[in-house]
Amino acid sequence: MDGLGVRNETTFNDWKARIQSASRFEHVFDLATDRQRCTPDEVKNDSLWSKYMFPKPFAPTTLKSYKSRLIKIIFSLVEEADLQNPAYDLDREFDSVEFQHLLVSPKELCKRMLELRSVTKETLQLTINFYTNAMNLPEFKIPRMVMLPRDKELKTIREKEKNFMLKNAIDTILNFIDSKIKLMNSDYVHDRGLIRGAIVFCIMLGTGMRINEARQLSVDDLNVLIKKGKLRSDTIGLKRKRSRKNTLNNIKTKPLELAREIYARNPTVLQISKNTSTPFKDFRRLLDEAGVEMERPRSNMIRHYLSSNLYNSGVPLQKVARLMNHESPASTKPYLNKYNFDESSSDEESGGNNRDSSTGSSANSSSLYYQTGD
């Protein structure tokens, strides 16, 4: 064997027990651990107090982490040719740490540790910190803009979890509206906020409008949107739009039909003051009553959600911008894939920003169906 690729997790697992059971391991571990202490200068440099310095014991979990780091460091110090020698004694590596004789630079150690296994930037940095402290080396920082493969993998997992939560939240709210709020009557004052919140939520989900834009629509406006797929209006004001006549688009039909059904039974419920925080309070109450728990829920997450799904299903960015009533595609870009998932299948997509990673459509799901007008 030529030694290429020998520094891997399988080889590490073979060496791990041998490193930890080596006669010198505990002694070197105690030395390396003690070198992790950061003694304040006012104690260390004081002739009086330095004599009475009390070394605070490390927590068991900290010692366990340190031991794991030292094992990986010793393994990474071994040259590849020696890794293939079952009789190798590791004295060279233990001497390096004990007597602070540098064999491998921090950067080279990073390289070798990345060959060993996929780790996060934080984990690698902590291990390098342990190494530089143990060897009395200058601080070594992994560059700020670096994102390791494991970080990307975990980021994708977190995005999937977040997207599952958002999808489930929207479906839960729609089911709550369809089963409970649809039957409510605005004659009861306590129910009005929920009815308002439900209508505005469905309009936002069906058109991509902002919360204060959505509450301006009438039942007649919804009829036109559902029938024709778009609505041109000179009475509905849109944020950051200079044009007097604005075009609204039907992006999702089912939520608009649900909004119309509730709105037709309560035609005056959205007649509230123009400058009021009521719509936002209604939105939060709707989520609470539906049993949806979200950290810092924001109404504009629906616009982000719709933009991403349109873009990922193949709709050009310029058209997505037009559907969102943005003046420029540059305004739409920050929306993309913030709350993204593949609506066409039960499996979440793995590429957060990969244009080619999700090309499915969502026509099979009533609550997620969308249509676009030209």
Swiss-Prot record:
GO: which molecular function terms?
DNA binding
- Active site annotated at which positions? 210, 239, 303, 326, 335
UniProt entry keywords in alphabetical sequence: DNA recombination, Transcription, Transcription regulation
Q: Where is this region: Disordered?
A: 328-374
Per the database record, which ranges form the Tyr recombinase domain? Answer: 169-349
Pfam families per the record?
Phage_integrase (PF00589)
* TM region positions: none
Q: Where is the composition biased (Low complexity)?
A: 357-367
* Highest rank taxon of the organism: Viruses
The protein's matches in InterPro entries, at most eight in alphabetical order, are given as: DNA_brk_join_enz (IPR011010), Integrase-like_cat_sf (IPR013762), Integrase_catalytic (IPR002104), Tyrosine_recombinase_XerCD (IPR050090)
GO BP annotations, alphabetical order:
DNA integration; DNA recombination
Q: So what does this one do? A: Involved in very late gene activation.
To which protein family does this belong?
Belongs to the 'phage' integrase family.
Name of this protein: Very late expression factor 1
Its gene is VLF-1
